[in-house]
């Protein structure tokens, strides 16, 4: 762990529920991992009964690796990848967003019903246009989205020792309403912050996911090194060209889209915000995934703030704190 990043992540999340993960995409080294509500390990034996029975806070749950959340619009990186694999290009895409789209009596709206007008693929991604991506999802279909999602380790084992497997339920017989919801990161899809960090790391590392690790080396009482961890490739999740194209989409989010608060801060960032609705009242978790120093990425972050609203409201400011701490502190 990077002590400065860990402290920054802990303090920036504050007393809110959620999780923060930071990785080095080129090695897989976990630089920070925070889950809240947390507990004091020094008093865990005295407080064990309270912690175990506190279902409201679930302090013993490591939300970073075990938490299961709707991905919201961060899932649009998956939908975008599936579109590219199907069409072989983002060029030629055009969509006229009127703020809502209805198919089979099911309506999807953009945030606050915003009308985006005519968009190409890059603009639709930067705007996080739900209508465009609902249309894209129905064109791709459930079977295609399932294949690409499983390529990105949904419904698959992850290179971790303790985690919950992310779930994706679409298939070739799924109906249009569920496909529309799933393509924008709602529906039945559930994912952990660590899993989203791994997908982002592959994008930042030319498509290759490195095996994540916490411990650099183990030494004995005499200071001699007993074992070391060497960075290791886990799996290629996408081609280098696919990773570069997704990176360009994510750069547009910071330059012209929903994460412009990260623009012009002395470093470059590519990212994707998300607002994951979790109840009938439209309450949402705040998401951000991204990486910095886009020409030679060295820091990946994935952040969720439970009940935090839009990605730009709660998660993006935490990302800014992490990037600032990494480059300037």
Residues covered by each model-derived region:
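Short hydrophobic alpha-helical segments used for membrane anchoring or interfacial signaling
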Residues: 20-25
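Beta-lactam-recognizing serine transpeptidase/beta-lactamase-like catalytic domain environment
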Residues: 26-73, 78-307
